């Protein structure tokens, strides 16, 4: 069974670790002692945190005794909670906290968010689970999540033709995007952006928007959405354009 430590760091402006919070099972850690923390997490397989891939791990890695699978709750949150008002623990790219500068408290929040993300992923349609895995399984920001839940992608019998990722995306968004969109090119060049766009489109909520941090990190999401949903192909046979853009 995968053992996960949920972590958060407080870092000063010079990159020094000032405080560390950690949770594994019923055990808690709250101290500035990096060596003691490395020992605390040494029996775990995974480290989970909010923005751990781009932030926490670069400060921790020099002190760790081994490599860990990294689970980042930040990058999955827009996929699994696309409806406004998003998740109750989130504000843009930050976890909402009850206390400033309390990494133990934030570690507990990261644990709660991860558990909600796992539940939300398991509640998705199986085809959408497969789509997200196909689009994101090779990206370090997402791969740890799939490993932590031991996700096994569907395998069709060898005598069936394998459905490509772009075909799956087109089918799952049928009637919600222009039928003449160059989905194959988008999937080839913008896999993460396709996943975020698909989540927003299927939310089917006019009030939902792409979170600001996603647009900062993946600015092509907006152009991709416009290409899929705002460019009228003029074909009367296109279910989306004829209904939504010619109305």
Predicted segments, located by residue:
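DEDD superfamily 3′-5′ metal-dependent exonuclease/proofreading module
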Residues: 1-247
């Amino acid at each position: 069974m995968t053992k996960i430590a949920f972590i958060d760091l407080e870092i000063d402006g010079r990159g020094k670790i000032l405080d560390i919070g950690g949770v594994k099972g019923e055990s808690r850690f709250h101290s500035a002692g990096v060596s003691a923390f490395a020992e605390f997490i040494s029996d775990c397989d995974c480290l989970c945190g909010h923005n751990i891939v781009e932030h926490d791990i670069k400060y921790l890695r020099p002190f760790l005794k081994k490599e860990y699978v990294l689970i980042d709750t930040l990058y999955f949150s827009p996929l699994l909670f696309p409806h406004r008002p998003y998740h109750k623990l989130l504000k843009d790219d930050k976890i909402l906290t009850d206390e400033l500068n309390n990494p133990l408290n934030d570690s507990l929040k990261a644990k709660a968010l991860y558990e909600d993300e796992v539940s939300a992923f398991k509640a998705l349609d199986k085809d959408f689970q497969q789509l997200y895995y196909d689009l994101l399984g090779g990206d370090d920001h997402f791969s740890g999540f799939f490993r932590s839940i031991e996700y096994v992608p569907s395998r069709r019998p060898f005598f069936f033709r394998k459905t490509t990722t772009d075909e799956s995306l087109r089918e799952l968004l049928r009637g919600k995007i222009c039928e003449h969109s160059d989905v194959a090119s988008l999937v080839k060049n913008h896999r993460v952006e396709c996943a975020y766009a698909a989540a927003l489109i299927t939310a089917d909520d006019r009030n939902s928007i792409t979170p600001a941090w996603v647009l900062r990190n993946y600015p092509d999401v907006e152009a991709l959405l416009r290409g899929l949903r705002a460019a009228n192909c003029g074909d009367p046979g296109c279910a989306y354009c004829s209904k939504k853009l010619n109305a």
